[in-house]
Swiss-Prot record:
It catalyses: ATP + H2O = ADP + phosphate + H(+); RNA(n) + a ribonucleoside 5'-triphosphate = RNA(n+1) + diphosphate. Specific enzymatic cleavages by the viral protease yield mature proteins. SUPFAM superfamilies: Clavaminate synthase-like, DNA/RNA polymerases, P-loop containing nucleoside triphosphate hydrolases. Residues 1748-1855 form the RdRp catalytic domain. Its cofactor is Fe(2+). The record marks 1472-1473 as: Cleavage. This is RNA replication polyprotein. The active site is at residues 994, 1075. Disulfide bonds: none annotated. Residues 1133-1308 form the (+)RNA virus helicase ATP-binding domain. GO terms for molecular function: ATP binding; ATP hydrolysis activity; cysteine-type peptidase activity; dioxygenase activity; metal ion binding; mRNA methyltransferase activity; RNA binding; RNA helicase activity. Its EC number is 2.1.1.-, 1.14.11.-, 3.4.22.-, 2.7.7.48.
C-alpha cells in the first residue's frame, strides 16, 4: 500500500522513462507558468499556513511564491479573487463601477479586453472618500429629479444624494464593497427611481451573525464586534484596518426578491460567497429564485443534542467536526482516558485555538471520560434510551445531572454531528417589511443608560421622591414595589405584565380574586398617568379575553394544600387578604402617591391601610370600592395581630370574628394592626386575651443553652439552677434590660423567673402543663411570642384547639389553668422567640427536680381509650434510627395500612374491608368510615379499630412530638412497631435481628412470625434486648433454637458448635464477631454416598486456565500401598493427633476396594519468596462462589488463609466465600470424602506432608477434584520422631510425584530487600528491591548478644532442645522457632544460632533457615570453635556457601527431583502481552501519547531455529604474576598536574580532572592526585568552559536564507551522488509496507522502552509550546575513556541537540525504514555496526582476515562537515525510495531553519537527530566510495564516522574536483593493528585494549560502582580470554600485564556477575 494515494495516470507515469516524463510534464509546466503570470499580481501576499489551507479548499489560487507582506493578506486575497476573477467573467463594458479606485479600474481594463470601455461613478459619501478618490472626478451641481415626493428623504441621504443623478434608467451597475452600508429603504428607493437592469454588488458581512454568534467563527480570516446597532469588522483580526458598518447590512443574505412600491420586482441571487465576502446580483424582473440559502464552512459544529445539557442551549460549538471526531475516537481508544491526553491531542490538531474552543474541549473531554457508550443501532438499549430521553424534557441544569441523559445526549451528538452551516429561508422584502433582527449573545450594559433614573420615571415615585439624581454605583438599598411598568409598550408583553399586576393587587390568601378583570381595568383607567391611560385605551375585547386566559393559566387559585389537606376542598366563608407592613416614612409616602394616582383616594403620611374581607359568591364582579381599602389613622389604631383559629375536633375551621378593631394608641415602631379574633380560645370556651408587644425589639438575643431544635436562656431573681431530664440551665441572673423590657411591654413585675427560647423552623412542643414543683402552684403563666409565628394549642376535657399567633403578641394563662388544662406549640417559624414568665415557689418549699420544662414536657403518663383500645403516651423516644431499621412504604395516604401490612401480611384493601364491619359507637362511626376511604389518612379512630379488629397492638414512635404512643387491646398477641414522622407511617424492625432472621430462614417463616413467637415465649427481657438494637447473646440463640426445634451447626472460625443436636430442623449457621447468618443446610454431607455433583460450586476447566498456565501439569496414579502405610500410622497414632483409633475413636482411613484412577495434578514449585502463596490467593478470590479447599501442614498457614478470606468478604460477599475452607492435613483426610465434587484442592508446602499423604488424599477425595500442589522440595521436609522408623525410609510425595518429570521451577525471589544477601543464596533476586545494607554480622559466643537489638526478637535454632538456650540468653520475649517450624514464614530481621548440634541438620532445613529474613540476618556462634573452623566444616554446605557468597543456582538441581526448568517468575502464555503497555508508560507525557500508536501488537509465534553448536578450541593461557602497582608504574609519570591540564577562559577554569578521592565510599587504590580517573578527562554539563569549547569547535552558525540558497545550489549534485552510492549498494526503490510498519513499531517501542518516570521528565519536549525549529543545545556528560584520550589535556565536549518530539516522531520511522532498506541489499563485504551484537562483529572480522596493512579513516569535525552536498544526496535518496514529498520538504525545512538560543545553525549533523547515525554512516560510505579506488574485493566496516578496511586503500583522483567542494575531510591511517569502534581487529577475532578495560575497572572500584558495570567489562575481556594463547601474540608486554589484572579482578568479583558471562570464568582459579 502506497504512503499516499496515486491516481492510475500517476501510476502509469512512474513507469515511463525520465525523458518521457519530461515531455509530458512540459505541458503542465507551461500551464503553471501561464497561470502564475496571470495571477501572481493578485495572489502574491504571504498568508499563514492555516489560512492557506482554507483558501485553497475554497478554490482560490495562491502563488507558490507568495512572499509579499500585507496588513490583512487573507481578506485582501478574497477581495482580489472576487474583483479580478469572479466579476470579470460576469460584467462587460456596459457596466458602470461605483465606489472603486481608479487604479483598480485601469488594472481591469488593461488585463481584460472586454472591459476596456467600463467607467467609474464615484462620489463623496464619507470623509475618507476625499482621500480615497481625490479630486479627479466632477460632481453635478443639479440635475433633473426623477423622484416622487415620497422619495424626498431617500434622495437626500448621503448614499444616494450624489449617485442617483449620474445613473441612467436601465443601466448596469457594479457596487464595490458598498451595499452593506445601504439600508433596505435606500436600496428599494434606488431601484424604484433609477430602475437599473442589473445591479451587481459585493457585500462584506459575517453570515454567522444570522444565528446570533457574537464572535467570528473564522478568526483566521476576520473578527468582529457588535456594539449597539453597529458592526465593527476587522479584516484578518487587524483592528487598525477595521471599519464600521450597520448591523442590519446583511439583509441581502436572507433576500430572494425585492418588491418595489410601484409593484416592480427585482430578483436577488448570490453569485459567489467566500466566508464573509459575497457577490450579489440584483436583476429586474420576476423570475424563479431559490427559497433557501446556506453559508459555510465554519470552524464550528451544530450543538445538536448537547444543547440540552449545556448552559443557555447554544446553537453551536466553535470547534471543527474533524477535531471533535478525532478527539472522541482517541479517547474512546485509550484504556485509561484522561483530560490531559485529550487536551494534548487537541493541541496537536489545532495549533492556536481560541479560548472558547479550549474551554469546550476541556469540558467535552470530561463528558466523554465520565460517560459510557449506548447501543442505539444494533441490539439497542431501549430502556436506557427511554429514560435518557425522558430526562431531556427537564431544564439543562437538571438534565445534566442525570447520567442516562448525558449518555443519550452524547451518543446523539456524535451520531448526528455535522459542521455548522447557516441555513436561512429567503424572503421577499419591501419598503414596509420588518427589518432583520440580529440577536447576539452579548450581555454588555447599554452605554448612556441610567437605570435608576428610568425606574424613577415609571408610574411610581417620580413626582413624590425627593432625591438627587445619580448613576447606579453598586449595591444600593432597593425598594420592593408591587406594581411597576417594566417594559415598553408591546401588547403581548404588556398583557403579561398586566396579568401580574392584576394578581398582585387583587388576590387574597387563597388565591381568590377580589375583583374581576374588567372592573380592575376600569379602576386602573382612573389613574392620572397619560401613558397608562393611553396604553389601556388601546386594549380591545380580544386583548381582554387574552388577558383572562393568561391569568387563568399562569396564576391559578392556590392555597396551602399541604397544611389544610382535605379541608382545602371544604374551605368556605370569608377570605382575608394578608396585611402588609409599612417599613418607613419614605415607603409610606410612595405608597400614598400610588394610591392617589390609582384610586383618587388621598392618603396622609400617618395613615395605614388594611384590606377588609371580601366574600366570594361566584359573581364576576365582587369588587366594592367602599370596602376595598379601609383607611385607619395610625394614631388611633390598636396594634393587635390577627390569629387564625383551627379546631382539631372539627374538620372545618371555626368562624372568625371580623368585627371592627377598637381604637387605641399605636406609637411603637414596627407595630402591627390586624383585624379578627383577639383571644386564645379553648374548646371549653375559655378565652385568653391577646395583646401586642409594643417594644419587642428591645430584647437581648442571648441563648447560651442548646436544646433539641432550639436555644434557651434561664433567668431568675433567686439565682436558682433549673434541671430536667434533657439537660440543665444555669441561672443568668435578673438583668436590668429584662426589667426595663417588662415595664415597657406591660408585663406584671411579680413574675420572678423567665425561660427564653428561640426556635428553629417547624419546632413543636407536646401537650403539657407548667406545674413543676419549682414553680408556685396555681400561679398564672405569662407567654410572649415574638419574631415569628406559631400555632398555640390548648387541651381540656372538651378537646383540643389551636390558635395561630402571628407577630409580636402576648397573653396570660390564668391561675389554676395548669391544673385543668394542657397546652402545646407547633409549626414555629425559624427565629420565633418565646418568653415564658412564671413565679417560683418559696425556697423552703421548692426542690430541684428532674422534670421536663415547657420545651421538653411530653405529657408523661397520659392515657385515654377509644373503642376499648387503651391509648398510652409512653416515655420520650430518641434515636429511633439508631436501634431500628426503617422500611419504606408509599406515601399515598395509605401509609399506615401499608406499614401495618408488613406485620399482618394482609393487603390494604383486605384490612379496610374487614374493619368496615367493626362495631363501634355512633360517635366514631362517621369518622372511621371516612378514614377507610381510599387514600385517606388514618387517625385515632382507624388506628384503634385496626388494633382491636386485627389483633395487633401498635407501638408508634412519634418523632415529631418526641414520645412513644401505645395502642393496646386486651387479648392481642401480636405487636407492630411503627414510626410516625412528618405525618407519614413507616414500619420498624429492630436493627440487630440477625438471630431472628437466621432462625426464620431455617424454619421457613417470616421474621415477624418468629419474633412474635419469641416475644411471647421469652417475655419482656428478650423484647428489651431486641429493641436496644445491640443484638443478643449466644445463650439466647440456644434458647431460640430449642423453641423452634432447630438443630444448629454453628461455624465459629475453624470450630464447629452443635446446638440442640436432636432438633427436627437441620441448619448451618456462621458466627463472626458480631453477626450470625444462616448458611442453609450443613455444607458437608453426612455420607459420601449422597455427595452429588453441584454445578454451581464445582470448578470447570475454564475457571482454572490461569492456574494451569502457571503450573506444570503432571499425571499421577496414587499408590494404594503408600496410602495404606500412612493410614496404618494414622490409625495406630504414630502419625498425627486426630486420626487414632485409641485416642480419637477413628476408624481405619484407607478405603477398601477403591480403584486407583490417574489424576492430573498442577504443580507450582519455586524457591523461597517467589510468591507461590500470594499468587494463589490472588487467583482464588476470582473464583467467587466456588468450592475451594486449602490444605496446609501448619496451623499458622491455615490461620493466614482464613485472614485473607475475611478480608475478601467485603468484595465478594458472604455467598462468594461460603464454600472456601482451610484445613490442616489431618482434618482434610477426615473430611475428604465429604467435600463437594469438582472442588479446587490446594495442597500447600507439599514437601512437609508425611509420605503417602498425597496417595491417601487422592483415594479418599476421588478424581473429580481439581488438585494443585505448591511447595519447594529444597526446603524442610517431613520428619517426626514418632514415625521415623516407619516412614523415614519412604520417599516423600513430591519426589514420588516428579520422578522423571520435566517441570517449571521459579528461581526469582522477591523476598530480599538488602544487598547483604546477594550471591549468598541459590536464587535470583529482584535487583530493584535490594538496598545497600550493612556487612554480614558474626557474633562470637552467647555472651556477646545484644538483647536490645532488633535481631534478638527472632531466633532460629536447629532443634527443640536449643530453644532452652535461647530462652536463657535472649529472654522470653524472643520468638524462637526451629528450622522446620519456620517453613512458610518470613521475618524482617533475626538471627540464627549455630551450635555443635546444628551440623547434623539436613541441608533442606539449613536453606530454609537462611532464607527466612528480608532485610538482615545475624549468626551467633555457640559451637565453641572459631569462625574459620566453622567455615571449613560447612565448606560444601549451604551455610558455607552463604558465608563465602558462593551459592549458585545450579546447586539446586542436585536437590530437586526430576528435571527442573528454571524460570524467572511465574510465566504464562502471553497473548496480547503489550496491550496497554505504551499507554501506561506515556501517562506522564500526554502529548507524546498522541504521536505514537497505542494499538496492541499482533501476537507472533517465535520460530525456533536449529543452531549448530561447535566445541570452541581451548588452549592453556599463561597469565604472568604481575601486581597492579607495577602496571601503574609504567605510565604514572604521564599524569600532569591538574593546573597544567585544565583550560582557562578569562577567570573561568574547566573542571575535567579530579584530584580528590571519590565521595561514593569507593576503594583508595592510589593517592588522590593520581587516581585512575585522572587519566581521562571527564565532561560535565555544568562545566561552562568545556561547553564553550564544544560550541566553538563542533557547531556552525548561519541564517536560513543563506543555507536554503546553498542547498538549492547543491541539489543538482544529488542524483550524481546517489548514482555512485547505488553502484556499490543497489537499493530497491519499491515500497515495502511490512517493512515500514516494522520500522514504525521499532521506533515507538524504543521510545516507550524507557521508564515512565523518565518519559514524564522529558514531557516538556512534547508540548507544542516547544517550537519545532528550535533545539536545546547541551554538552554530553561522560568520562572520555578512548585510548587517544589518556593523559591528555582538557578537551572539548560533545554537543547534543534536543528536538521537539514531534520532529522525532515525524522522521524517525522513515529513517528506520531507510536503514532496513539498506540492510536488505547490503553486500556481505560491507558491515554496518548498527543493531548487531559483538559476536556478529567478531564473526565478520574473522571471515574478513584482517591481517597486514589495513586502512583506517577518521574525520575532523564530522558532524559539522555534513554540508549541503550531503543533504542533497539524502534528499535524492528519500525521493528514490518513494518517501512522501511533504516529509522531504519538512526535512529540508529542519535542516535549513533549525536554531537555538545561541542562534541559527548552518546545515550540519546533530547528535540527537532521528537520522544521525544512519546518515552519518551513509555519508561515510559515500565518501569512501568516492575517495578510494575500490577493486571490489575489500571488506570494509562502517559505523558512523568510523571506517576500517582489511587492506590498503588507494586514493582515487576521479572525483578530485568534487571532493574539494566538500567540507568533509578524512584523516587516513594505514596500520598493522587496525581498530574499529575501540576494538582491535585481527584474523583471530576482536579484543579490547586491556589497558582501557583495566583502568575502567579501577575507576569503578574507586567510585564504588563495580557491581553495576562489571558485566559489561567482563564481556569485553571475554573475547581476549576466549582467544586463549593466541591473545598473547596480539599484545605487547604492557597489554598482557593489564589483561592479567583484568581477569584477576573479574574472577575475584565473580559473585557480582549477573549475566551468563559468568560461566566463561567458572574454570578460572586465582592463586
Amino acid at each position: 500500500m502506497a504512503l499516499t494515494y496515486r491516481s492510475p495516470v500517476e501510476e502509469v507515469l512512474t513507469l515511463f522513462e525520465p525523458t518521457a516524463q519530461s515531455l509530458i510534464a512540459s505541458a503542465a509546466v507551461s500551464a503553471f507558468q501561464r497561470h502564475e503570470k496571470d495571477n501572481f499580481e493578485w495572489f502574491r501576499y504571504s498568508v499563514p499556513a492555516f489560512a492557506k489551507e482554507h483558501l485553497s479548499k475554497a478554490g482560490i489560487y495562491l502563488s507558490p511564491y507568495a512572499g509579499f507582506p500585507h496588513s490583512h493578506p487573507v481578506c485582501k486575497t478574497l477581495e482580489n479573487y472576487i474583483l479580478y476573477v469572479v466579476v470579470p467573467s460576469i460584467v462587460n463594458s456596459t457596466f458602470f463601477f461605483v465606489g472603486i479606485k481608479d487604479f483598480k479600474i485601469n488594472f481591469l481594463k488593461s488585463r481584460f479586453d472586454k472591459l476596456n470601455m467600463i467607467s467609474a461613478l464615484n462620489r463623496y459619501v464619507s470623509s475618507a472618500d476625499k482621500i480615497r478618490y481625490g479630486n479627479d472626478f466632477v460632481i453635478r451641481a443639479g440635475v433633473e429629479h426623477r423622484a416622487l415626493k415620497r422619495h424626498r428623504g431617500l434622495v437626500d441621504s448621503p448614499t444616494l444624494k450624489a449617485l442617483m443623478p449620474n445613473v441612467k434608467s436601465g443601466s448596469k451597475l457594479f457596487l464595490h464593497d458598498e451595499l452593506h452600508y445601504w439600508s433596505k429603504e435606500e436600496l428599494i428607493g434606488f431601484l424604484e427611481i433609477c430602475e437599473p437592469e442589473v445591479l451587481l454588488g459585493t457585500v462584506i458581512y459575517p453570515p454567522e451573525l444570522l444565528i446570533g454568534s457574537d464572535c467570528s467563527l473564522n478568526p483566521w480570516c476576520y473578527e468582529y464586534e457588535v456594539k449597539k446597532k453597529k458592526l465593527l469588522f476587522y479584516p484578518d483580526g487587524v483592528r487598525s484596518e477595521g471599519y464600521e458598518q450597520p448591523l442590519s447590512g446583511g439583509y441581502l443574505l436572507q433576500t430572494s426578491r425585492i418588491k418595489l412600491p410601484n409593484a416592480g420586482i427585482y430578483c436577488v441571487d448570490l453569485l459567489c460567497s467566500r466566508f464573509a465576502h459575497h457577490l450579489f446580483s440584483i436583476t429586474r424582473g420576476d423570475l424563479i429564485t431559490p427559497d433557501n440559502r446556506s453559508f459555510g464552512p465554519f470552524e464550528a459544529v451544530h450543538s445538536g443534542a448537547l444543547a440540552g445539557i449545556s448552559r443557555g442551549k447554544p446553537n453551536f460549538y466553535p470547534v471543527s467536526q474533524h477535531t471533535i471526531l478525532r478527539v472522541y475516537r482517541y479517547l474512546r481508544s485509550l484504556k485509561k482516558p484522561d483530560k490531559q491526553s485529550a487536551m494534548a491531542k487537541f493541541s496537536q490538531i489545532v495549533h492556536e485555538p481560541c479560548g472558547r474552543a479550549v474551554k469546550f474541549m476541556e469540558e467535552f473531554s470530561d463528558l466523554i471520560i465520565n460517560t459510557g457508550t449506548l447501543r442505539t443501532v444494533i441490539n439497542p438499549e431501549q430502556v436506557k434510551l427511554f429514560f435518557g430521553n425522558l430526562g431531556r424534557c427537564m431544564p439543562p441544569c437538571f438534565a445534566s445531572k442525570l447520567k442516562g441523559t448525558r449518555t443519550v445526549c452524547l451518543d446523539e451528538f456524535i451520531s448526528m454531528l455535522r459542521p455548522l452551516s447557516v441555513d436561512v429561508t429567503l424572503e421577499t422584502i419591501s419598503m414596509h417589511s420588518m427589518t432583520m433582527v440580529v440577536t447576539t449573545w452579548s450581555q454588555e450594559a447599554e452605554e448612556g443608560v441610567d437605570l435608576p433614573k428610568i425606574f424613577e420615571e415609571k408610574w411610581e415615585g417620580k413626582q413624590s421622591l425627593d432625591r438627587t439624581e445619580a448613576p447606579y454605583l453598586g449595591l444600593a438599598p432597593f425598594v420592593d414595589y408591587k406594581i411597576q411598568w417594566r417594559l415598553q409598550f408591546n401588547i403581548p408583553k404588556f398583557l403579561n405584565q398586566l396579568a401580574e399586576l392584576f394578581v398582585n393587587s387583587c388576590s387574597v390568601n387563597g388565591g381568590v380574586r377580589s375583583m374581576s378583570i374588567p372592573a380592575y381595568l376600569r379602576r386602573l383607567a382612573t389613574c392620572r398617568s397619560c401613558v397608562g391611560r393611553a396604553m389601556l385605551c388601546c386594549l380591545t375585547e380580544v386583548d381582554i379575553a387574552s388577558l383572562r386566559v393568561v391569568v387563568r393559566n399562569r396564576y391559578p387559585y392556590t392555597e396551602d394544600f399541604y397544611r389544610c389537606r382535605r379541608r382545602w376542598f371544604l374551605r368556605i366563608g370569608a377570605q382575608r387578604r394578608p396585611s402588609f407592613y409599612i417599613e418607613d416614612a419614605k415607603h409610606l409616602e410612595r405608597l400614598g402617591q400610588f394610591e392617589e394616582e390609582q384610586f383618587q383616594r388621598p392618603m396622609s403620611r400617618r395613615s395605614l391601610y388594611t384590606l377588609a374581607s371580601v366574600s366570594m359568591n361566584g359573581t364576576d364582579d365582587p369588587f366594592c370600592s367602599d370596602c376595598f381599602y379601609d383607611p385607619v389613622p395610625v394614631a388611633r389604631a390598636k396594634i393587635v395581630p390577627t390569629p387564625t383559629v383551627i379546631v382539631e375536633r372539627a374538620l372545618e375551621p371555626l368562624a372568625i370574628d371580623t368585627g371592627t378593631t377598637s381604637d387605641a394608641p399605636c406609637d411603637a415602631p414596627g407595630a402591627t394592626c390586624l383585624r379578627g379574633a383577639q383571644a386564645v380560645v379553648c374548646a371549653c370556651g375559655l378565652s385568653m386575651a391577646v395583646s401586642a408587644v409594643p417594644y419587642a425589639e428591645l430584647k437581648m438575643d442571648f441563648y447560651p443553652d442548646a436544646l433539641k431544635g432550639r436555644d434557651a436562656a434561664w433567668y431568675s431573681k433567686e439565682d436558682r439552677e433549673y434541671k430536667y431530664n434533657g439537660g440543665s440551665h444555669l441561672c443568668r441572673g435578673w438583668p436590668k434590660w429584662l426589667q426595663l423590657w417588662m415595664q415597657a411591654n406591660g408585663v406584671d413585675e411579680t413574675y420572678d423567673c423567665m425561660l427564653a427560647q428561640r426556635y428553629g423552623a417547624q419546632g413543636k412542643i407536646g401537650f403539657h402543663a407548667d406545674n413543676e414543683e419549682i414553680f408556685m402552684r396555681g400561679a398564672p403563666v405569662h407567654t410572649v411570642s415574638m419574631d415569628g409565628n406559631a400555632d398555640f394549642g390548648t387541651e381540656c376535657a372538651a378537646g383540643r384547639q389551636y390558635t395561630t399567633l402571628r407577630g409580636n403578641v402576648q397573653f396570660t394563662m390564668p391561675s389554676g389553668f395548669q391544673e385543668t388544662h394542657k397546652h402545646a406549640v407547633r409549626n414555629t417559624t425559624a427565629g420565633r422567640v418565646s418568653y415564658t414568665f412564671r413565679r417560683l415557689a418559696k425556697k423552703d418549699e421548692s426542690r430541684v427536680i428532674e422534670e421536663v420544662v415547657e420545651v421538653e414536657t411530653k405529657d408523661m403518663g397520659f392515657s385515654s381509650s377509644l373503642f376499648g383500645v387503651q391509648i398510652i403516651v409512653d416515655e420520650p423516644c430518641d434515636g429511633v434510627e439508631e436501634t431500628f431499621n426503617v422500611q419504606c412504604v408509599p406515601g399515598d395516604g395509605n401509609c399506615f395500612w401499608h406499614s401495618l401490612g408488613s406485620f399482618t401480611g394482609l393487603t390494604v384493601e383486605c384490612m379496610k374491608a374487614g374493619i368496615k364491619n367493626f362495631a363501634c359507637g355512633p360517635e366514631g362511626a362517621e369518622k372511621l368510615s371516612r378514614q377507610l376511604e381510599p387514600n385517606v389518612w388514618a387517625e385515632d379512630e382507624a388506628l384503634c379499630a385496626a388494633c382491636a379488629h386485627l389483633g395487633v397492638d401498635l407501638v408508634i414512635f412519634d418523632e415529631d412530638q418526641g414520645f412513644k404512643m401505645l395502642y393496646r387491646y386486651p387479648g392481642n398477641k401480636r405487636e407492630a412497631l411503627l414510626r410516625l414522622k412528618g405525618s407519614h407511617f413507616e414500619p420498624l424492625e429492630p436493627k440487630e435481628m440477625c438471630v431472628v432472621k437466621a432462625i426464620a430462614q431455617a424454619v421457613k417463616r417470616s421474621p415477624m412470625d418468629v419474633l412474635r413467637v419469641a416475644l411471647k415465649k421469652m417475655g419482656e427481657d428478650f423484647k428489651e434486648q431486641i429493641c436496644r438494637g445491640k443484638g443478643v447473646m449466644l445463650d439466647v440463640f440456644m434458647v431460640l433454637a430449642k423453641i423452634f426445634d432447630v438443630s444448629a451447626c454453628v461455624l465459629q472460625g475453624t470450630e464447629q458448635i452443635m446446638i440442640n443436636p436432636k432438633g427436627r430442623i437441620k441448619g448451618l449457621f456462621r458466627m463472626t464477631t458480631d453477626h450470625l447468618s444462616y448458611d442453609g443446610v450443613p455444607d458437608k454431607v453426612k455420607h459420601s454416598e449422597v455427595n452429588v455433583y453441584k454445578h454451581d460450586v464445582a470448578l470447570q476447566i475454564e475457571d482454572l486456565i490461569e492456574l494451569r498456565e502457571l503450573s506444570s501439569l503432571v499425571e499421577y496414579t496414587p499408590s494404594f500401598s503408600r496410602a495404606k502405610l500412612l493410614a496404618d500410622c494414622l490409625h495406630d497414632g504414630s502419625t498425627g493427633v486426630m486420626c487414632s483409633e485409641l485416642y480419637n475413636d477413628k476408624g481405619h482411613l484407607c478405603p477398601e476396594g477403591r480403584e486407583t484412577t490417574r489424576v492430573t495434578i498442577g504443580v507450582l514449585l519455586g524457591t523461597f519468596g517467589c510468591g507461590k502463596s500470594r499468587l494463589f490467593k490472588e487467583i482464588l478470590f476470582k473464583l467467587c462462589g466456588k468450592s475451594v479447599c486449602y490444605i496446609s501442614p501448619r496451623k499458622a498457614l491455615c490461620d493466614s488463609f482464613d485472614d485473607e478470606i475475611r478480608k475478601a468478604r467485603g468484595n465478594m460477599g458472604e455467598r462468594g466465600i461460603k464454600h472456601y475452607k482451610s484445613l490442616t492435613f489431618e482434618k482434610a483426610i477426615l473430611q475428604a470424602s465429604k467435600l463437594h465434587k469438582g472442588s479446587l484442592v490446594i495442597i500447600d508446602e507439599i514437601q512437609l506432608y508425611p509420605p503417602g499423604y498425597l496417595d491417601l488424599l487422592l483415594l479418599l477425595a476421588g478424581p473429580t477434584m481439581k488438585y494443585f500442589a505448591l511447595g519447594d522440595p529444597c526446603q524442610s521436609d517431613y520428619d517426626s520422631e514418632k514415625d521415623r522408623t516407619i516412614l523415614g525410609s519412604v520417599r516423600s510425595d513430591v519426589f514420588e510425584l516428579l520422578d522423571g518429570i520435566e517441570y517449571k521451577f521459579n528461581i526469582l525471589s522477591r523476598r530480599f530487600q538488602s544487598s547483604l544477601f546477594r550471591g549468598r543464596l541459590p536464587c535470583l533476586m529482584y535487583e530493584e528491591d535490594l538496598e545497600a545494607g550493612a556487612p554480614l554480622r558474626l557474633i562470637d559466643g552467647l555472651e556477646s548478644i545484644d538483647t536490645s537489638a532488633a535481631y534478638s526478637r527472632c531466633c532460629l535454632v536447629s532443634s527443640f532442645e536449643e530453644k532452652k538456650i535461647v530462652n536463657a540468653y535472649f529472654g522470653e520475649r524472643t520468638k524462637c522457632l526451629t528450622f522446620g517450624e519456620s517453613t512458610g514464614m518470613t521475618f524482617d530481621v533475626g538471627c540464627v544460632l549455630i551450635t555443635s548440634i546444628s551440623a547434623h541438620t539436613s541441608e533442606q532445613r539449613w536453606i530454609t533457615a537462611l532464607s527466612r529474613f528480608r532485610k538482615d540476618i545475624v549468626f551467633v556462634n555457640a559451637a565453641s570453635v572459631a569462625w574459620d573452623t566453622l567455615q571449613s566444616v560447612y565448606a560444601n554446605r549451604w551455610l558455607g556457601r552463604f558465608l563465602n557468597r558462593s551459592a549458585r543456582q545450579e546447586d539446586l538441581r542436585r536437590m530437586l527431583p526430576g528435571t527442573p526448568l528454571f524460570v524467572e517468575g511465574f510465566q504464562k502464555n502471553l497473548l496480547g502481552a503489550d496491550e496497554g503497555k505504551r499507554e501506561c508508560k506515556l501517562e506522564g507525557d500526554p502529548w507524546l501519547k498522541t504521536m505514537v500508536d497505542l494499538l496492541q501488537v499482533e501476537d507472533m509465534e517465535d520460530i525456533e531455529i536449529a543452531k549448530e553448536v561447535l566445541q570452541d578450541e581451548w588452549c592453556k593461557t599463561h597469565l604472568p604474576q604481575c601486581e597492579l602497582e607495577s602496571v601503574r608504574a609504567r605510565w604514572v609519570h604521564k599524569i600532569l598536574a591538574k593546573e597544567f591540564r585544565e583550560k582557562r577562559m578569562g577567570c573561568l577554569v574547566s573542571e575535567q580532572f579530579t584530584d580528590q578521592h571519590s565521595k561514593q565510599m569507593g576503594k583508595h587504590l592510589t593517592n588522590s592526585a593520581e587516581r585512575f580517573e585522572t587519566i581521562y578527562p571527564r565532561h560535565r554539563a555544568a562545566d561552562t568552559v568545556t561547553f564553550i569549547m564544544a560550541v566553538r569547535k563542533r557547531l556552525s552558525f548561519s541564517c536560513p536564507i543563506k543555507e536554503s540558497a546553498k542547498l538549492n545550489q547543491a541539489l543538482p549534485y544529488g542524483p550524481f551522488l546517489l548514482k555512485e552510492f547505488l553502484k556499490r549498494v543497489p537499493l530497491k526503490p519499491m515500497h515495502d509496507r511490512k517493512m515500514m510498519e516494522q520500522a514504525k513499531f521499532d521506533f515507538e517501542e524504543k521510545k516507550t522502552s524507557k521508564s515512565a518516570a523518565t518519559i514524564e521528565n522529558h514531557s516538556n519536549r512534547s508540548c507544542r509550546d516547544w517550537l519545532i525549529d528550535v533545539g536545546l543545545v547541551f554538552s554530553k556528560s561522560q568520562l572520555c575513556t578512548k585510548f587517544d584520550n589518556r593523559f591528555r589535556d582538557a578537551k572539548r565536549a560533545q554537543t547534543i541537540v534536543c528536538f521537539q518530539h514531534a520532529v522525532l516522531c515525524r522522521f524517525a520511522p522513515y529513517m528506520r525504514y531507510i536503514e532496513k532498506k539498506l540492510n536488505e541489499v547490503l553486500p556481505s563485504k560491507y558491515y554496518i555496526h548498527s543493531g548487531k551484537g559483538l559476536e556478529e562483529l567478531n564473526r565478520w572480522v574473522i571471515e574478513g582476515r584482517f591481517e597486514g596493512v589495513c586502512t583506517e579513516s577518521d574525520y575532523e569535525a564530522f558532524d559539522a562537515s555534513q554540508d549541503h552536498y550531503i543533504v542533497a544526496f539524502e534528499i535524492c535518496l528519500m525521493r528514490y525510495l518513494g518517501l512522501p514529498n511533504d516529509l522531504i520538504e519538512d526535512y529540508k525545512f529542519i535542516k535549513t531553519h533549525l536554531g537555538s538560543k545561541l542562534g541559527n545553525f548552518a546545515i550540519m549533523r546533530f547528535s540527537g537527530e532521528a537520522s544521525t547515525f544512519l546518515f552519518n554512516t551513509m555519508a561515510n560510505m559515500l565518501f569512501t566510495f568516492l575517495q578510494y579506488d575500490l577493486k571490489g574485493n575489500e571488506r570494509i566496516c562502517f559505523a558512523g564516522d568510523d571506517m576500517c578496511a582489511n587492506g590498503r586503500l588507494h586514493v582515487s583522483s576521479k572525483h578530485k574536483n568534487f571532493m574539494s567542494k566538500l567540507k568533509l575531510k578524512a584523516k587516513v591511517s594505514n596500520t598493522m593493528n587496525p581498530t574499529f569502534c575501540g576494538w582491535n581487529l585481527s584474523s583471530d577475532g576482536i579484543f579490547k585494549k586491556p589497558q582501557l578495560v583495566l583502568e575502567r575497572l579501577c575507576i569503578a572500584k574507586e567510585t564504588n560502582n563495580l557491581a553495576n558495570c562489571i558485566d559489561n567489562y567482563a564481556i569485553e575481556v571475554s573475547f581476549a580470554y576466549l582467544m586463549g594463547e593466541r591473545a598473547k601474540q596480539r599484545m605487547d608486554e604492557e597489554e598482557v600485564e593489564a589483561f592479567y589484572n583484568c581477569v584477576r579482578i573479574i574472577v575475584k568479583s565473580k559473585h557480582l556477575l549477573k549475566s551468563d558471562v559468568a560461566t566463561i570464568y567458572q574454570t578460572a582459579r586465582v592463586d
